[in-house]
Amino acid sequence: MSAPSKHFALLARLLHWLMALMILAMLFIGAGMVASVSARHEWLIHLHKPLGIAILALVIVRLVVRFSTRQPPLPEDLPGWQVLAAKLSHVLLYALMLVLPLLGWAMISAAGDPVMLSSSIELPPLLSANATTFAILRKAHGYLAYLLFLTVLMHLAAALFHGWIRRDGVLESMVRGKD
């Protein structure tokens, strides 16, 4: 039997980096949306919606890839609390990548607005229009976006810690391809 790979599968790595760029863009677009009342606001909304749906679709693909391919093992000398932190942070990242787009979609539905991906593609509403539900979902979407931002920062810090301080191959497992 061959030794487990030290690297993630190519498709897993491609999805990781594509989604990392999309999520960073989404966080900045979202911040720009809530901070702007200019004409740019409408343009940012029209970027935010389809990008959120794309992230939702890609995270589903990513979960299929994650559960159908082998993951490189964490270093054997990694302290137990760091192993737990790695596992929990990945669960949180995946949960947020699933929940935030769904909350956004539900929020727009609760506002009574059409969920438009483009000028000709409209998604069905997830909820009926309700101002109270909209207000609750809007707050939840905002708070969870902050949580996603903090989780991404922790993920990045952990990756750099593994790459620059521990030099244990964890960062390289998502950057490089061949063993």
PLM regions and their residue ranges:
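Membrane-embedded alpha-helical bundles that constitute the cytochrome b-like, heme-associated redox core
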Residues: 1-179
